[in-house]
Amino acid sequence: MASLYQRFTGKINTSRSFPAPPEASHLLGGQGPEEDAGSKPLGPQAQAVAPRERGGAGGRPRFQYQARSDCDEEDELVGSNPPQRNWKGIAIALLVILVICSLIVTSVILLTPAEDTSLSQKKKVTVEDLFSEDFKIHDPEAKWISDKEFIYRERKGSVILRNVETNNSTVLIEGKKIESLRAIRYEISPDKEYALFSYNVEPVYQHSHTGYYVLSKIPHGDPQSLDPPEVSNAKLQYAGWGPKGQQLIFIFENNIYYCAHVGKQAIRVVSTGKEGVIYNGLSDWLYEEEILKSHIAHWWSPDGTRLAYATINDSRVPLMELPTYTGSVYPTVKPYHYPKAGSENPSISLHVIGLNGPTHDLEMMPPDDPRMREYYITMVKWATSTKVAVTWLNRAQNVSILTLCDATTGVCTKKHEDESEAWLHRQNEEPVFSKDGRKFFFVRAIPQGGRGKFYHITVSSSQPNSSNDNIQSITSGDWDVTEILTYDEKRNKLYFLSTEDLPRRRHLYSANTVDDFNRQCLSCDLVENCTYVSASFSHNMDFFLLKCEGPGVPTVTVHNTTDKRRMFDLEANEQVQKAIYDRQMPKIEYRKIEVEDYSLPMQILKPATFTDTAHYPLLLVVDGTPGSQSVSERFEVTWETVLVSSHGAVVVKCDGRGSGFQGTKLLHEVRRRLGFLEEKDQMEAVRTMLKEQYIDKTRVAVFGKDYGGYLSTYILPAKGENQGQTFTCGSALSPITDFKLYASAFSERYLGLHGLDNRAYEMTKLAHRVSALEDQQFLIIHATADEKIHFQHTAELITQLIKGKANYSLQIYPDESHYFHSVALKQHLYRSIIGFFVECFRIQDKLPTATAKEDEEED
């Protein structure tokens, strides 16, 4: 019966599907009390042998049976005279042994490093910790509003205006008022007279939401509802201030409304919207998720006199229907436009309207280029009050054109063109302009030798009386500029973030924009335990806010730009630091592995009580889409932390071919063969770990979500060096299983246009891989209302698993979206994943052979 019980197909797990987590010592190879109590009694000989055999490989018990011969029994029955004992010799021998043992013990004590006894007093990280206030990182969301002032939100909830030079603080909004309004978000008007609050906010997709908005005079004014003239108590899709005074816009039913100042009636300036079909100033699903990476698709001119907005038309895009199973007798569906690989894409156009005087709508003209028959708009940025920069990307995503458009005529002039044999990466990043708009800085891929291209800063300068621009590189090297922050014309300096130190780090640099282009690291060794940063500058660049994101607990400090002097700490997250100090946090190590011509980074998480003599289970986590990064020095406390701290597992991550920030050669290796090279690199990482004596080779697992779920499922059947199973179990959360079922912009970027050559799509199907699954435990988790990766992917996968008689479990979340916005659902999700791996890593008692044979005979 045991073999039949172990092999099941189609079991749907609930919260009770996983047993109570065993102690960490059980995962390390010890036997838990439950197993001791439940084990079958053994005969005298088996009991005598078992303790001697318990120290075998992996710490698992072995059982031996020894047949007794007739001679043995005769020896026991025949009596004999006992020999005379030499008591003096025995005493001397015992004394010598005692002295030797004492010397050995003394040597061990003297030579062994002192153990951190404080670890035993520290708690282990739990799932509850992930959601507790003690572990909640507070981001003050500081925003510069002048040369010397910024606005931020303190931990208690109040909104503060702070002057850097005088160090004076003014409370703009009391935290109690925000609580009374049940506000989720706030925004202060540029003149600091009014605040805009949103409440009853409901998420739509990853970034978008709907909600009710009110305006309130600072500091104690009564709230007044923000509504279109024709509707009261309206639920808006967006509301936000402009760059000057009290001007604001809001979007209702995909139409744009403008209000010159608070108290004046709003007017509808764009009225072509159609709910769910034609979007004005907002992204549809595809643009929000894959192109702009934001729900906002409108952009104010610097002086507030004009507004650029995108019109996205989904009328020709096929409809996808998300079912809702609960809450009604009959299931209902929510339709929305979702373009899959090869299907019709949304069309997009860019418009500019004047906000002073009669509304005049002007469309910006796309490039007249046959390669741009179908295109995306990936970036919009105002250069001056009348010039707007636009990046146009063809559907194949291998040709982009950066233009500068005249907002008064709609004519666009090409400023730069880029082309790739694979795909173009980082196409939604904004350039930084000089005040007159004649000079701008942007990031592009520049050849740097054998490792391919790296992303560096280029300056483009317009020449008087010439149609040609002067192009010059500001930075170079085998590292990437990750973001241009700002340009200081007065000092001829450019400020940016880069990976020059290490790919897994981010530091703040400045570079001269004239002469030698000399650069300087501003954040290196500036703050302790801070190697991964982001930053923002005051309007005149005299001061900057430095946000340390790791490896230590995140902090925010304010510095003088000239001498980097720390002026004060804005947020130290002291309660998180204390909570971390009181917990057994994982030890983090970094290594590199050599795969063909590449040196790939690995990150290893070990238990705080790690010792080389124990045996630990191993979990490989594969995550992130091509161009992303899993190995970094950012601070994180996740469910993986719980698995390491509370359950004694070792977790490993590896940035293999296809990952970002290591050159375009490595990035583009995966083109048209997703999964193939990633499997090789991730398996090399596993093989490297299996060479370590402290890794239990019989307890190895893999996990991934989204694209990582595709990879984890792809990797799970992989064989080891002896053609045996490498992985004991694996799990995939919301896996992509067939790229022709996924978003057009994503699939076509890496596999080419579907319909022209479908071989890459067929080769990357998971159906070809899961047939090789044998007895590994496989947990699939998916929300039924997942708007990003439809449950259809999992349904197709399960069909193949059933055909292959695979050993799988399915856990669904009815009517839940992709991003699990509910805290309760996230807790349940994390417990389910942890519980699955704890059970997978449990060391089962090996029954004696005779007992096993009896079970088989009973079957």
Swiss-Prot record:
Tissues expressing this chain: Detected in brain cortex, hippocampus, thalamus and cerebellum granule cells (at protein level). Isoform DPPX-S is expressed in brain and some peripheral tissues including kidney, ovary, and testis; in contrast isoform DPPX-L is expressed almost exclusively in brain.
One example GO MF annotation: potassium channel regulator activity
Family annotation (SUPFAM superfamilies): alpha/beta-Hydrolases, DPP6 N-terminal domain-like
Membrane-crossing segments per the record: 90-110
Main location: membrane
Function: Regulatory subunit of Kv4/D (Shal)-type voltage-gated rapidly inactivating A-type potassium channels. Modulates the activity and gating characteristics of the potassium channel KCND2 amd KCND3. Promotes cell surface expression of the potassium channel KCND2. Has no dipeptidyl aminopeptidase activity.
The protein's assembly and partners: Homodimer (in vitro). Interacts with KCND2. Identified in a complex with KCND2 and KCNIP2. Forms an octameric complex composed of four DPP6 subunits bound to the KCND2 tetramer. Interacts with KCND3; this interaction modulates the channel gating kinetics namely channel activation and inactivation kinetics and rate of recovery from inactivation.
Protein name: A-type potassium channel modulatory protein DPP6
Organism of this sequence: Rattus norvegicus (Rat)
Lineage, top ranks: Eukaryota, Metazoa, Chordata, Craniata, Vertebrata
Gene behind the chain: Dpp6
